[in-house]
């Protein structure tokens, strides 16, 4: 039996009862020359990575088992279970992206298939095919990404209630900046779950203390008088299906177009989904020379490694003496809400609204943060199962940095939740996080992260 899938992120599973002199299981099948999956004779599981590459594992379940394949954009997790509750992964992150007509000819799809081999018979039951993109009802935890000034790396923390966050890996980096960035350090990490269920993480390629750490001989990458504080020319893009294994691309603006050879900064990149264009939209702070910062946007491909359009102006602050930076765009209902930082009279957070992701945006004159000192890096996130939104921002205007939080249900009235460890929001094992972002994740995703980053006591 073959089934043609209609989703990029789906789960297919079936209960298999293997008879005598029989080997049966579940495959993703393109042709006789291209397939992947798992079969069993009741004694061993044989996992096919492709037609010519396979391995075996002991079958401790027996002749009756449930086989499951989770296809996440041609990235497979193949598992088996006795009861459909506890699953044993046999292989994870199996790439089947080359199982298509360009490689194997024909114009077929990679389809779920039930397979039975040998003289004996098999019984298949309870076949399942379903879209695997989690909805809010499936969420059970929160994931925060941020950077710390001492490490210039990606850090992660998890909360199960949206109030108390515990850093993974004992607050050490989960992705070291010097392994992914041209400047050997990153800032401003942002994470976004796309409509395909994948995770898209972007960050500034910039080490503010690169000279001190021995990564360069000058204070900045280029002349500060000509290009300004913290000058850089690129960003880092990373994509993952499981929050552990990440693809990685250094996007350098001068390589995108010669028009950006003199770009002075590319800061705080974030990603959203443009529902009208049906594309991932990357937006960021940028300026040339010593001009004021403006917000720009461009569309990025699904692989998250190439711009599909040149950057265009998203927002220029109307006061010619002030700039707009650090945008955070979230679609709520029919409106795109853009929180951003400006320095018009004070340095804090304002809001602009639009019917479209790429604008135009209508500004208002209200300040939203409650910080008595300068803040930046706004990030908006929703409490699971509640009509409550939390605006988090980076309070950098004091010696010891911290995150501030305000909460709203209508974006008119806001409740001040204070800062980490100075109110209801708690940071268990870390301090002084910088420019972060929070998303909802499932219990399975949270537990996978905790298991992967657990440290020995």
Residue positions per predicted region:
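Active-site neighborhood of glycoside hydrolase catalytic domains
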Residues: 274, 297, 336, 340, ...
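Surface loop/turn signatures of beta-propeller and other carbohydrate-active proteins
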Residues: 55-60, 89-111, 133-139, 146-147, ...
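Structural motif
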Residues: 151-157, 210-216, 230-236, 291-297, ...
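Loop/turn-rich, solvent-exposed surfaces of beta-rich toroidal or solenoidal domains
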Residues: 344-351, 355-361, 368-404
């Amino acid at each position: 039996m073959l089934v043609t899938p209609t989703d990029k992120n789906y789960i297919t599973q079936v209960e298999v009862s293997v008879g005598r002199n029989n080997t049966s299981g579940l495959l993703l099948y393109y042709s006789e020359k291209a397939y992947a999956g798992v079969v069993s004779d009741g004694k061993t599981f044989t996992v096919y990575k492709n037609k010519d590459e396979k391995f075996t594992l002991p079958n401790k379940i027996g002749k009756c088992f449930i086989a499951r394949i989770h296809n996440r954009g041609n990235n497979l997790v193949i598992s088996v279970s006795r009861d459909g509750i506890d699953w044993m992964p046999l292989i994870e992150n199996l790439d089947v992206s080359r199982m298509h007509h360009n490689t194997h000819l024909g114009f077929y799809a990679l389809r779920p298939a039930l397979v039975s081999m040998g003289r004996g018979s098999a019984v298949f039951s309870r076949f399942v095919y379903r879209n695997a993109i989690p909805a809010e009802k499936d969420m059970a935890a929160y994931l925060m990404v941020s950077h710390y000034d001492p490490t210039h790396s990606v850090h992660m923390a998890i909360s199960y209630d949206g109030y108390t966050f515990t850093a993974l890996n004992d607050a050490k980096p989960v992705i070291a900046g010097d392994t992914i960035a041209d400047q050997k350090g990153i800032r401003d990490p942002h994470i976004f779950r796309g409509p395909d269920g994948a995770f898209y993480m972007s960050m500034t390629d910039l080490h503010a203390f690169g000279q001190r750490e021995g990564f360069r001989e000058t204070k900045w990458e280029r002349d500060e008088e000509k290009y300004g504080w913290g000058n850089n020319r690129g960003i880092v893009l990373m994509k993952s299906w499981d929050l552990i294994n990440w693809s990685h691309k250094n996007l350098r603006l001068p390589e995108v177009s010669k028009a950006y050879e003199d770009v002075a900064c590319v800061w705080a990149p974030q990603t959203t989904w443009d529902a009208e264009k049906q594309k991932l939209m990357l937006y960021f702070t940028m300026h040339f020379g010593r001009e004021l910062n403006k917000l720009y946007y461009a569309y990025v491909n699904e692989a998250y490694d190439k711009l599909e359009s040149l950057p265009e102006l998203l927002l220029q602050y109307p006061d010619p003496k002030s700039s707009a930076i650090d945008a955070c765009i979230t679609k709520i209902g029919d409106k795109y809400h853009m929180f951003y930082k400006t320095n018009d009279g004070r340095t804090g957070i304002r809001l602009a609204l639009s019917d479209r992701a790429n604008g135009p945006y209508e500004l208002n004159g209200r300040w939203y943060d409650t910080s008595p000192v300068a803040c930046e890096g706004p990030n908006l996130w929703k409490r699971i199962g509640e009509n409550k939104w939390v605006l988090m921002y980076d309070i950098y205007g004091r010696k010891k940095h911290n995150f501030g939080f305000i909460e709203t249900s209508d974006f008119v009235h806001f409740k001040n939740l204070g800062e980490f460890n100075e109110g209801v929001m708690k940071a268990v094992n870390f301090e002084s996080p910088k420019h972060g972002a929070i998303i909802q994740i499932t219990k399975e995703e949270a537990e996978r992260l905790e298991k992967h980053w657990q440290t020995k006591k």
